[in-house]
Amino acid sequence: MAKQRKNAPGFEESVARLEEIIRLTEAPVTELEDMIALVEEGNKLIRHCRSILHDAELRIQTLSNPETVQDKTDTDEPDSNEFSLT
């Protein structure tokens, strides 16, 4: 299982929320301050999803060819257990 904080949303939940954020930001009635908050939340969710995908890619590489996979934990990718929407 992927390293995630218990309160961090999963990938599918994050993507669903991103889709909702897109709909809300496209709505002409969304106030500017609300739009800014939605964009900030969306950026955090995007980083979270990228981290999940990065971890999954490393796991797949390890399973596919465990002898040639280098330790890639020192990348600039955010750690999935660092998720916080606040």
From Swiss-Prot:
Region labeled Disordered — which residues?
Answer: 64-86
Q: Which family does it belong to?
A: Belongs to the XseB family.
The cross-references to Gene3D superfamilies, in alphabetical order and at most eight, read: Exonuclease VII, small subunit (1.10.287.1040)
Q: What is the annotated role of this protein in its UniProt record? A: Bidirectionally degrades single-stranded DNA into large acid-insoluble oligonucleotides, which are then degraded further into small acid-soluble oligonucleotides.
Query: What quaternary structure, including any partners, is listed in this protein's UniProt entry?
Result: Heterooligomer composed of large and small subunits.
Give the reactions, separated by semicolons, that this protein catalyses: Exonucleolytic cleavage in either 5'- to 3'- or 3'- to 5'-direction to yield nucleoside 5'-phosphates
The superkingdom of the source organism is Bacteria
For this UniProt record, the keywords arranged alphabetically read as follows: Cytoplasm, Exonuclease, Hydrolase, Nuclease
Question: Disulfide connectivity?
Answer: none
What cellular component terms from Gene Ontology apply here?
Answer: cytosol; exodeoxyribonuclease VII complex
Q: What is this protein's record name?
A: Exodeoxyribonuclease 7 small subunit
Task: Give the originating organism.
Answer: Akkermansia muciniphila (strain ATCC BAA-835 / DSM 22959 / JCM 33894 / BCRC 81048 / CCUG 64013 / CIP 107961 / Muc)
Q: What is its EC number?
A: 3.1.11.6
A molecular function (GO) term = exodeoxyribonuclease VII activity
Q: Could you mention a single GO BP entry for this protein?
A: DNA catabolic process
Spell out the subcellular localization from the entry: Cytoplasm
